Amino acid sequence: MTSMSLRTQIAQALGKRVTIRLRDSDGGLRDVVGVLQSETELVNRRGEIITFDPDTAVAFRVIPVFNRRDISSGSLSMYDTMSRTLKEISGRDGAVRIYCCGPTVYRDAHVGNLRTFLLSDLVSRTLQMTGLEVTLVQNITDVGHMADDFTGDDKILAESAKTKVDPFEIARIFETRFHTDLARLNIQGADSYPRASEKMTEMISSIERLIELKHAYVGTDGSVYFDATSFPSYGALSGNKLEALKPGHRYEFTDEGGKRFHADWALWKLAGARTQMIWDSPWGAGFPGWHIECSAMSIELLDGHVDLHIGGIDLRFPHHENERAQSNSLTGDETVDTWVHGEHLLFEGRKMSKSAGNVVLLQDIIDRGLDPLSLRFALLENRYRSQMDLSWASLEAAHTTLKRWRQLLADAGDGTTVKFDQELSDAFTTDLDTPRAMQRIRAIEKDISIGALDKRALFLFADQVLGLDLDRGVEKKEITPELQALLDARITARAEKNWHMSDSLRDQLADAGLEIKDGPGGQSWSWK
């Protein structure tokens, strides 16, 4: 059952635009977005009434609504991988359509994956700040993510073979965990999370159309391949020109398969000996290639045009290069206006990999007693298109600062006034310069000329994009007489320069959950 606190939040949000994450009967999660009409109904942008069961809600967020006076006069510009320049993200008719490559649900998303998903959230929030409507689609790859075009090894099937668990059950388990992590990171839900397994008709239709247009062919092995040479501008996104690509440019080269050209890729693979996750098609039972799902989904769900396409830098080639070739061939136009890629994330100086044993999950951060939004905070300290080296030290520092900022807002009262700040707005709208925004927040915190209420209002303005829940509130705990006695004894010990006793008392207080700081004004404390 949904906790009373969550039900209360829903009941108190009538008339507001919200996103509610619901658990389906099959264990999967979906998001409904719209204006809340009652505790069980909302109206989406198309005017449709969506009925939901609040007892299946696992996360709930009110989507920020900006007053005109709080909206930036500027517009968001992002670095476009295609043109290698900053481009204004304007959309059409006051709305921006975004497609973000989602997870392949055969394992938990690690913190590097989550950095990319955070990017789409920051973009959406910033566009909303500039007064634009946002439609975000993020796919769920639950079939078709092959290790290569030759063997047809599907990552989910490989996990199924290893664990002896049904492949679709594996997909639903990790899809649920993915949505749980998004909620923990305060990432607003997308308008749609289409599953590859549920878009087979659209993918088959797209492949048929590509064959008609002479951009695809049935290979000698019976599988269907995209003809890379049929798309003259192949390589414009990644810089990998066809004439420069050599056999084995993506995978270990093999002579197997029915391709005409080594750079062609599979759109549909015949099942062969495979017995799971296969579908009927005009070419025989089989399964889709990885790249076709994003073309089919984005064209269908975003009306044939994507204003902004977001993904990790590792997807630029071959996935996005191939997707662009497919989509443009299907629409006859440049389907995506702007391509944005987030850079790699290292952890303590090393690339994360399962074999190296240094993959870090959001749950690992929580297990260390850190606020999950400490990860969001730490990621905000770095520009999205700069490689970042995350560490436990930076996460712990983020946790400490997050607590301090929440305490600052709590001490200032519970006002909801938001105060516009031009420097913060400029930082967000200039290629998502979140490090500059964080520096500005720190400057506001230290500025003694800004009153407590104004600081709170400025922090709330920033938090509409930062998404750190700075007004969440701080748990109030009473100091027991025993703890007060320890605090007083430590003050006495320091006055007597009994440093050994002072340190011992600090440790005892820390064990009780108190964090002690010594400064020019003497001893201060806060709850951990």
Where are these regions (language model features)?
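Conserved RNA-binding domains used in RNP assembly and mRNA/RNA metabolism
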Residues: 1-74
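Amphipathic alpha-helical interface segments
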Residues: 34, 178, 437
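N-terminal alpha-helical targeting/anchoring segments
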Residues: 39-42, 47, 123-127, 443-447
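Alpha-helical recognition segments enriched in aromatics with Gly/Pro capping
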Residues: 72-106, 121, 180, 199-413
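N-terminal, positively charged nucleic-acid-binding surface of large information/translation enzymes
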Residues: 91-186, 525
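Short, glycine/charge-rich beta-strand/loop segments that flank catalytic centers
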Residues: 137-145, 174-178, 188-203, 221-229
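Structural preference for alpha-helix termini/caps and helix-kink/transition segments
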Residues: 351-354, 358-528
